[in-house]
Amino acid sequence: MLSSTDFTSASWELVVRVDHPNEEQQKDVTLRVSGDLHVGGVMLQLVEQINISQDWSDFALWWEQKHCWLLKTHWTLDKYGVQADAKLLFTPQHKMLRLRLPNLKMVRLRVSFSAVVFKAVSDICKTLNIRRSEELSLLKPCGDYFKKKKKKDKNNKEPITEDILNLESSPTASVSSVSPGLYSKTMTPIYDPINGTPASSTMTWFSDSPLTEQNCSILAFSQPPQSSEALADMYQPRSLVDKAKLNAGWLDSSRSLMEQGIQEDGQLLLRFKYYSFFDLNPKYDAVRINQLYEQARWAILLEEIDCTEEEMLIFAALQYHISKLSLSAETQDFTSESEVDEIEAALSNLEVTLEGGKADSLLEDITDIPKLADNLKLFRPKKLLLKAFKQYWFVFKDTSIAYFKNKELEQGEPLEKLNLRGCEVVPNVNVAERKFGIKLLIPVADGMNEMYLRCDHENQYAQWMAACMLASKGKTMADSSYRPEVLNILSFLRMKNRNSASQVASSPENMDMNPECFVSPRCAKKHKSKQLAARILEAHQNVAQMPLVEAKLRFIQAWQSLPEFGLTYYLVRFKGSKKDDILGVSYNRLIKIDAATGIPVTTWRFTNIKQWNVSWETRQVVIEFDQNVFTAFTCLSADCKIVHEYIGGYIFLSTRSKDQNETLDEDLFHKLTGGQD
């Protein structure tokens, strides 16, 4: 054993700054320690020397120079490499953080600054009652995000005060928290699937939760639309390079908030990062559906995603409808008994969860192999050729499509047969001009083959489009989701069809609407207010009978049908190239896009990726595909780890299944996104 003299010679003084919540200023505490003292022993000495009776269980040591937490309390100071010159801070692991939600509402809640962001987001989503937290993450707003708003504030003499939803007593504050909001893994419905209000049987849960009735209303219902002036003051990306800037601030999911320089009471954006939405269910996901709707709405209004004027009016009509229903839903009494029988609701929920399909069609699905056969027009783009469609006889069976010169030759060899498994299916529709097209991008070794199909009418288009979409996922028309998919497509086409609208019930003059609030500023400038209101009201007749939650889901589906949906852009420089390009990352592919023209150059499917990693020395993302195809690029608009995490994150999400319930393999996520060989 060491004598006291030996200990003194082997020990040294360590200064620890204590971040005491009850005092305004931090205080330094000097301890005498040795290198073989474990971190837990240091914390014990600190608490004894501070001599204040309180719960210190949430406190931990933060090493300022190394920018890391000392969370392994059994490790010694020597093992961590802590010496006398180390600047340590004894501080709570949970701190207040301000989050701006997709609906632009600001919430303030207590979050772990020591847990990795993946875990912190999971806890945040439990507090806010958002399932499938793996689809979301935290984003630092880019410098241009508040640019226009600040410019306007300079001319405003009165300070702007914002109504912040304070959830300081949120369950993320401790591991042994009380009721986790309305978050539930049971099969008990917790929301009315029609209007999104909390089911009466769950209202008692609110007594222990920061999510009161009013707070739930703020999160689950759409907020009143912004004025056209406020909308015009928001940042709107004008190019792919501008859109790339918006995605530069995603936090590293494998590191903590503190490690990434986030300060207490700092401001971040909570957003859906991955455009792969799993198991959306109105009975559990009122908040999730609303926030997803809001993110889609702002993407349309701020032109973060392109759409036609016809589509913009459909989105405007749905927004107007949702806004009206939200105002009426918020005035309802949440505690009223549901008129829906519980058994009927459970069966209805099962039908929604199983994504359509009836039990009596099961035998038919097994024994029949459905087939589509009809005349369609085909066009294959080639350089220096005009876009000319030629008619062929097409046959669709299993996941393959074949075409013949005419119907009589169907029993012979086709001109070409293509397997659509893994292909990209893009709608190419203009209802007003009666054009119903399908764009197919079929994967080949060095990219994609492009072809266009043209249908004659809505029903034909819906059947073939649904078949192509299922085939791209490896499913056939025998799948129970085929029929619902056809109906969804037809429903969306009817929303676009102005001729199907009934006679307008009220004139624009009598409408309680500011039409400029529901379209992008650029679209608003093209039309007079009365003209715009009349067109929105005309489109509204096609959706006027929709319940609130269904209208939001229709909006999300329409958003998903846009050609650019799900693409996240980054400015990159490919290895061997002398110019910058745009890299588009989607749920199933990478796209190299010409930064000047916006034209796709090459597409790589995730299914063809063999491995990918980050070369930290050169800061390059290196990807190996099948058939010995390699590509490497340096990220110019963001850290290379962000793009690497996107690729691994989407591959991780593709492993989810309903058999897993809501348990996630967090280790697999970090293995796929960590950026190591």
From Swiss-Prot:
Please give the function described in this protein's UniProt entry: Involved in cell adhesion. Contributes to integrin activation. When coexpressed with talin, potentiates activation of ITGA2B. Required for normal keratinocyte proliferation. Required for normal polarization of basal keratinocytes in skin, and for normal cell shape. Required for normal adhesion of keratinocytes to fibronectin and laminin, and for normal keratinocyte migration to wound sites.
Q: Which keywords appear in this protein's UniProt record, sorted alphabetically?
A: Cell adhesion, Cell junction, Cell membrane, Cell projection, Cytoplasm, Cytoskeleton, Membrane, Phosphoprotein
Pfam families in the cross-refs: FERM_M (PF00373), Kindlin_2_N (PF18124), PH (PF00169)
Specify the protein name: Fermitin family homolog 1
Principal place where this protein is found?
A: cytoplasm
Q: Establish whether keyword Ribonucleoprotein is in the entry.
A: no
Q: Name one GO biological process term.
A: cell-matrix adhesion
- Residue numbers of Phosphoserine PTMs: 170, 179, 361
Species source reads Pongo abelii
Q: How does it assemble?
A: Interacts with the cytoplasmic domain of integrins ITGB1 and ITGB3.
Note what the entry says on domains. The FERM domain is not correctly detected by PROSITE or Pfam techniques because it contains the insertion of a PH domain. The FERM domain contains the subdomains F1, F2 and F3. It is preceded by a F0 domain with a ubiquitin-like fold. The F0 domain is required for integrin activation and for localization at focal adhesions.
Q: Which InterPro entries match?
A: Band_41_domain (IPR019749), FERM_2 (IPR035963), FERM_central (IPR019748), Kindlin/fermitin (IPR037843), Kindlin_2_N (IPR040790), PH-like_dom_sf (IPR011993), PH_domain (IPR001849), PH_Kindlin/fermitin (IPR037837)
Question: What residues does the PH domain cover?
Answer: 337-433
Q: How does it sit in the membrane?
A: Peripheral membrane protein
